[in-house]
């Protein structure tokens, strides 16, 4: 029987997030795609998971982060928007925009075991994610076959996206 004395913040976080657990991971893994079609799952925000009839799996623009977490910086000072930020330039706003996650995290990146490519259309932080990169590098069993040669899962994106991945430790090849 559960006891309140055993509940900690860490247990709550680990037991609650991602909100869907591995439900969607399991659904994707168990889905057989009919010939001549493909399957697609919305991962929240801008993310998509695409699976083909040949069992090719592509994550596109998957973000599993939380956005901004506080109005304040580490010194307790209220954060303001960088005047060069596109929203500040467009609107003249100076108050920090929240960029909070508005939909649940539906896919557990650390439960991904089969993926053929990670794709980021651009480097806005809701299109590219360090958690998925780390999970793919450490957990994926299936390697991509290119021209009959087994290779690591490719991370595909613009120069800015690939530079960001490299800065996180994703290997060049």
Regions found by a protein language model. Name each.
Residues 3-35, 141, 147-173:
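Metallo-beta-lactamase
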Residues 47-52:
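Short beta-strand scaffold segments in enzyme catalytic cores
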Residues 18-19, 104-105, 124:
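Short hydrophobic/aromatic-rich motifs at helix boundaries and adjacent loops
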Residues 60, 128, 157:
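A conserved hydrophobic position in a structured secondary element of the catalytic/binding core
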Residues 24-33, 53-119, 131-135, 142:
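Pre-active-site segment of Zn-dependent metallo-hydrolases
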Residues 131-136, 164, 168:
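A short acidic, amphipathic alpha-helical/loop segment
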Residues 40-44:
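A short catalytic or substrate-binding loop motif that flags glycine-/basic-rich loops and adjacent residues
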Residues 46, 65-67, 123-128, 162-165:
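Active-site environment of divalent metal-dependent phosphoester hydrolases
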């Amino acid at each position: 029987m559960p006891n309140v004395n055993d509940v900690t913040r860490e247990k709550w976080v680990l037991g609650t997030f991602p909100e869907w657990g591995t439900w969607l991971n399991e659904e994707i893994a168990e889905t057989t795609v009919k010939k001549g079609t493909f399957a697609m799952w919305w991962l929240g925000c801008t993310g998509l998971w695409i699976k083909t009839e040949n069992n090719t799996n592509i994550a596109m623009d998957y973000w599993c982060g939380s956005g901004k977490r506080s109005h304040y910086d580490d010194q307790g000072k209220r954060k303001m928007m960088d005047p060069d930020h596109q929203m500040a330039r467009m609107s003249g706003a100076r108050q920090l925009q929240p960029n909070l996650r508005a939909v649940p995290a539906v896919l557990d990146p650390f439960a991904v075991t089969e993926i053929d490519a990670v794709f980021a259309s651009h480097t806005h932080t809701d299109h590219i994610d360090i958690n998925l990169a780390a999970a793919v590098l450490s957990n994926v069993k299936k390697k991509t076959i290119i021209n009959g040669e087994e290779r690591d899962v490719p991370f595909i994106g613009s120069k800015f996206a690939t530079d960001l991945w490299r800065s996180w430790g994703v290997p060049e090849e």
